[in-house]
């Protein structure tokens, strides 16, 4: 599910209502991840804004690099720069009865950790072979010890 960035609370609410209607709300892990870092302003590629108002067709407006850093506070810099403000993305996980409410973990994970997490949650094993062809090893580690337990690192 991809959520519209303009109204994420409505889209997530719609999903939660549907899960409740299906009686699966207490049996579903929901993970919400945003994009990394704020836009850092105009780079080497410049697009002419013309005489348009911001938001009109043909307009192109971005915040400058100084405002971008405020959008990434408390982290330094912005998208395209390898400081935390440019590479970090928050992850919010929800699973009633499994994940403690209000807990904040300052550990590090990666998108490659999601597939091992889902396999672990489902009690499934990643196949070593598929249709007679050996598969590559699954990268990443399960995040369940962090999500369900008290661990900060896996």
Predicted segments with their positions:
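Beta-strand elements within well-structured catalytic alpha/beta cores of enzymes
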Residues: 5-8, 12-15, 29-35, 90-92, ...
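Short acidic-aromatic active-site loops that bind/stabilize oxyanions
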Residues: 1-6, 82
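C-terminal cap/loop subdomain of S1 sulfatases and analogous C-terminal strand-loop tails that border
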Residues: 57-84, 98-107, 112-154
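Surface-exposed helix-capping loop/turn segments at secondary-structure junctions
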Residues: 14-27, 121-130
């Amino acid at each position: 599910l991809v959520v519209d960035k303009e109204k994420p609370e409505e889209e997530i609410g719609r999903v939660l209502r549907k899960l409740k209607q299906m009686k699966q709300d207490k049996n579903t892990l929901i993970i919400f991840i945003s994009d990394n870092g704020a836009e850092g302003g105009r780079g080497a590629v410049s697009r002419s804004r013309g005489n348009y108002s911001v938001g009109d067709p043909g307009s192109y407006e971005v915040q400058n690099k100084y405002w971008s850093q405020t959008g990434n506070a408390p982290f330094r810099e912005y998208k395209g720069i390898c400081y935390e403000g440019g590479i970090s993305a928050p992850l919010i996980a929800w699973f009633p009865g499994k994940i403690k409410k209000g807990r904040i973990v300052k550990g590090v994970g990666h998108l490659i950790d999601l597939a091992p997490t889902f396999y672990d949650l489902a009690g499934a094993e990643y196949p070593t072979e598929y249709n007679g062809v050996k598969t590559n090893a699954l990268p990443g580690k399960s995040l369940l010890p962090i999500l369900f337990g008290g661990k900060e690192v896996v």
